Amino acid sequence: MVGPRTRGYAIHKLGFCSVVMLGINSIIGAGIFLTPGEVIGLAGPFAPMAYVLAGIFAGVVAIVFATAARYVRTNGASYAYTTAAFGRRIGIYVGVTHAITASIAWGVLASFFVSTLLRVAFPDKAWADAEQLFSVKTLTFLGFIGVLLAINLFGNRAIKWANGTSTVGKAFALSAFIVGGLWIITTQHVNNYATAWSAYSATPYSLLGVAEIGKGTFSSMALATIVALYAFTGFESIANAAEEMDAPDRNLPRAIPIAIFSVGAIYLLTLTVAMLLGSNKIAASGDTVKLAAAIGNATFRTIIVVGALISMFGINVAASFGAPRLWTALADSGVLPTRLSRKNQYDVPMVSFAITASLALAFPLALRFDNLHLTGLAVIARFVQFIIVPIALIALARSQAVEHAAVRRNAFTDKVLPLVAIVVSVGLAVSYDYRCIFLVRGGPNYFSIALIVITFIVVPAMAYLHYYRIIRRVGDRPSTR
């Protein structure tokens, strides 16, 4: 679709098929390579069901985000929707926590990449897995941040290259795993699916990790679904560039479910092949790329790991470019100080990059590079958006504002699905064991506690103070809308 012309050039909008492909590419990332071990350990032979439940939940929330795009066509997704529904007072908190969540997500991805790289390069060295503050892993992490900064200096062409590299890497690795795995299963009559029982142990269910209620399959599935949901993260960012899409109010609600269904089918096929090859091997593996543990052939296993590594590298480059821009967008809108949006001669917002990189490094250090806890944190941090955006959609659907008058209401997508998203989000959020974030070896993790307080309380509070100080300075009163 060709849009309006700017300076003599036609602006090409993303059509329906392009939005579907964007959705698939946004969702399929490192998650499917990293999460199967933990999910099998938590759910045993029911691991595929955990991915199905995670996919259904992701689909519901994705439709909620897409439906909200019918009312708000500007870029920004959760920040734009919340601001339109409740005004700046709520929008500021969502915008700031969204930027923080993106920084955490980048840190988790960078941690996975560094851990995998060190294990591939130095497989028999104990120092490659050291978790101390001053360790080879920390130094490699800092070096990797430096490499990403250098790549950012090359601008958009480097980002396009990174996206292409990531797509090729993950497509090659998944295709090789599925095709090669099916060939082994059919020619050698391999079926180790039942070994998932040996890896399974029922997990106690406790509210917020404090009040234990019971122990059984339900509690295990709840935690397994949270971990599996990491493999679907990315769907919430599809609507970020709504202005670049052709008829987003019509295409997004149709494209996102198709993308989620396609990704879910790929994940189920991948997981089934992996569990047939060796469920117990995946669950017992100490490697970052758990999926490769099911493969007995060393060469084949290396191909999968390298493909996953290439995919993670590309995703990290894209995250290092996108996450700082969330801070600059808030600065451009007056929510944060303008110096956060200042760019150097290479068009890189250095202050925002430094803030993002600091948060990206801080959380993996606080959680001692623990992959399971980092995965949980990356998912739980997103629940602020998963709860507030559905509430915002309900408010937008009830709005009688002129700009929303032309939008056709649909009781199912405007009310039922948002309520389902809220209930499930709250249920999953209270099911998570937060002790893994706030405690370490039985004692308080003061580093992690301080980070949570600073990022989710202090920083938003400072944003509010800055915004209202600016409002008073220009002699205007902030609108509650």
Swiss-Prot record:
InterPro entries the record matches: AA/rel_permease1, APC_superfamily
Matching Pfam families: AA_permease_2 (PF13520)
UniProt KW Membrane keyword: yes
Primary location class: membrane
UniProt GO MF annotations: transmembrane transporter activity
Family stated for the protein in its record: Belongs to the amino acid-polyamine-organocation (APC) superfamily.
Record protein name field: Uncharacterized transporter Mb2001c
Organism, scientific name: Mycobacterium bovis (strain ATCC BAA-935 / AF2122/97)
